[in-house]
């Protein structure tokens, strides 16, 4: 496709974030404004990331998007909301007299290709990374340098938290137009270098009820959710921020587990009830509490989003022993060498005392694999043209 003007192509990556004070429920469905503030940990992109390439050209006849190699409907309302918002900000920037770094017409159509290096829609916060990456990449294409919380949030609420590294707060805000519902960093990724994150992948299948439908039903039917948002979350946000600033793992871990349990309690309080946890999820919860009881302190902490996969926080000196405990209780059926992905973990032998305390009959194959990772940075621009997911013709490159 010979183009009269050079095509503008930008590729970026964005991280997954895991909430330790959960967001569940919107007060405005269209603007995606939450009923409570939330706080999350950004995971490292070496293990989990979305990569997005956006290109604009006068030769494109329509906006198009490909996710993990498959073309999707660009008419999806949330995709449209993101695009509209970015183009509005670009027009505003231009009308404010800023010099346009890329002399291009806002009427040009955009092609977007995006891929995750982890299962989509399996409770690994893929939409958060995806929409954060989309917002960040489109902003680079259109020369927008303002806060992108609103753009990302219009795609997926928790996406605004993936715009920053480290520890991130999404302030619920009070304004009806949502201008004060923004994400901000509580502490950078360098703040707590010993913190480690283990993702226990129970299922890579799509969940039975998506988050959007689930939280809408909860807002309509759960009195517990309303009480949580109004009375319990504000002091929890302050306490969680303090735990992080002081690097107090015991308090951080306990509050993380309590908040996860309370979130799932609001799901059960929803009518009809929603259950995102599986039998394996509940066994992991039991394993964590027995492991901590054996040590007489909180050394590991679980949290579950709207899905059965566990995210476990711990410190680097505990990772090896806890991974061994998981292997003992949930032995891999066959793929022993592929059971652990991500950061290397030295194998260790469990003490007989700990095995006795765990006291669970092993359930082979119920955990598919573990991803070992750590706290990481926010979105990144990839300067290497070889990283582009779109070819010179503006279409996805063939899979290597």
Swiss-Prot record:
Q: In which pathway does it act?
A: Steroid biosynthesis; cholesterol biosynthesis
| Chief place of localization | cytoplasm
Provide the family line: Belongs to the diphosphomevalonate decarboxylase family.
Localisation per UniProt entry: Cytoplasm
Q: Subunit structure, briefly?
A: Homodimer.
The modified positions for N-acetylalanine read: 2
Example GO molecular function term? Hsp70 protein binding
Q: What is this protein called?
A: Diphosphomevalonate decarboxylase
The source's superkingdom equals: Eukaryota
* One cellular component (GO) term of this entry: cytosol
